[in-house]
Regions:
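Short amphipathic alpha-helical segment within the helicase RecA-like ATPase core
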Residues: 1-201
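A generic structural signal for tightly packed, nonpolar segments enriched in small/aliphatic residues
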Residues: 8-10, 134-429
Length: 429
């Protein structure tokens, strides 16, 4: 699928999208929900068009400006397909958009978002036999090898142990495909701020000895969504010559069962020196993120920290149309996330910033535990609190934890993955 903007007014064969209902139109848009419904119906249109044409034109010149970014973002997200391993390819369709009401810069930004969101989803959808921690790390190196502002360091398993990344070590030790800890440093001249992006990179999650059910294990090769989003965001931002320094940290592991696997109630020393009781091996994402967060704070003194993870599925359970939930102590960042999300039709819900729940992390046999907290049915909140425990107090104000969805495949509600929101949030800094 290729997205192009056209400056030439389309003919009568175009699909007319409008916010005015008193004219002859194909799609009427007046709200967030109408955009969701439109993106679903457009899927069916595309199936027909692929059989009869090589392109499709959307005339959105009559669409209110407030809906333009949202409409374009959602239809491109909804039409995404991953067909790399299908031998009989579906004909690629060119999508032309006529939108004279927006500037060339806005169009350029939308193309950047759409292209890099697609590349991110392609990374997410790679199966675990094609994307091990090592191959993911190597692919990242190849992606940035021509960018002179980017340097990459890949910690292999022995170096992970040597650095004291005990929680990454504990999970990564379970597999014949050992862990990697990827550090990507985008460092433009005269940068004034440092932003750390941290992504959960579990290339396959069986749950380990806290093994998942058959149904729950499906699509767990996508548990590297957080790491993929971080890489995709840096690719997009570096191509715009973004002004601030960006550090991307990707702890990459397989969570599988073996003779070396971590077991329930084992105790492990984290990077920050705290001991952690591993009550639930299937709560591995928060473990590797905890080490990465502590590593970021100690080594880079960041002005902002954003972590991304398919951690608990809270966003999916709370509402079918939420792209992600998030935890932050910063009201301004929260307002920015909400406002940008409204502009791009990526809805989110803020997890309550109740820091007093830190005391519920206490273990009887270690400093903290990673699961089985006294506050039941609150995993989205408690996993956020667990992560905050590994961030020194002075860094907590400008930290946001994004609990995102497994949404890089074609789902029934065409949910967006939040890429546009994350990209524009960082651009504002």
């Amino acid at each position: 699928m290729i997205i192009l903007f056209t400056e030439k007014k389309p003919n009568e064969n175009s699909i007319i999208v409008s916010s005015k209902s008193n004219i002859n139109i194909d799609i009427y848009i007046d709200s967030f929900l109408s955009i969701i419904m439109a993106s679903q119906s457009i899927k069916n249109i595309m199936k027909y068009k692929r059989k009869n044409s090589e392109s499709i034109i959307f005339d959105i010149s009559l669409l209110d400006k407030q809906f333009v970014n949202a409409f374009i973002n959602r239809i491109t997200q909804g039409l995404y397909t991953f067909d790399k391993y299908i031998t009989k390819k579906i004909k690629s369709l060119k999508i032309y958009i006529y939108a004279p009401q927006i500037s060339s810069q806005v169009k350029e930004d939308l193309v950047t978002i759409c292209q890099n969101a697609k590349h991110t989803r392609d990374m997410v959808n790679e199966p675990s036999n094609k994307s091990t921690p090592a191959t993911f790390a190597n692919n990242v190196t190849n992606l940035f090898k021509k960018n002179k502002k980017v340097s990459i360091k890949i910690l292999k398993f022995k170096e992970i142990k040597k650095q004291g990344l005990g929680l990454v070590d504990a999970i990564g030790n379970s597999s014949i495909n050992p862990a990697r800890f990827v550090v990507i440093d985008y460092h433009p001249n005269n940068s004034k701020k440092c932003i750390c992006l941290i992504g959960k990179g579990v290339t396959i999650d069986t749950g380990g000895y806290s093994i998942k059910s058959t149904a729950s294990m499906n699509n767990m090769h996508m548990d590297k969504t957080g790491a993929s989003i971080c890489v995709g965001l840096l690719k997009a931002l570096s191509n715009t010559n973004y002004k601030n320094r960006i550090i991307v940290l990707c702890p990459l592991v397989e969570n599988v069962i073996s003779n070396n696997s971590i077991k329930p109630n084992d105790i492990v020393k984290a990077y920050n020196g705290q001991t952690v009781e591993i009550v639930n091996v299937d709560a591995e994402g928060r473990l590797i993120l905890a080490d990465a967060l502590a590593y970021a704070c100690k080594n880079y003194n960041p002005d902002y920290i954003f972590d991304f993870a398919t951690l608990t599925g809270w966003s999916e359970r709370i509402h079918c149309h939420t792209s992600f939930t998030y935890f932050t102590l910063n009201d301004k960042l929260s307002n920015d996330i909400t406002n940008i999300g409204n502009e791009y039709a990526e809805r989110s819900i803020r997890i309550p910033p109740w820091t007093d729940y830190l005391q519920l992390l206490k273990s009887n046999v270690a400093d903290v535990k990673n699961s089985d907290f006294a506050c039941k049915n609150s995993d989205g909140l408690m996993s956020s609190i667990f992560l905050m425990n590994f961030i020194p107090i002075q860094y907590r104000k400008n930290w946001v934890h994004f609990d995102i969805r497994l949404n890089s495949y074609n789902n029934n509600v065409n949910i967006a993955d939040g890429f546009a929101s994350f990209y524009n949030m960082i651009l504002k800094i």
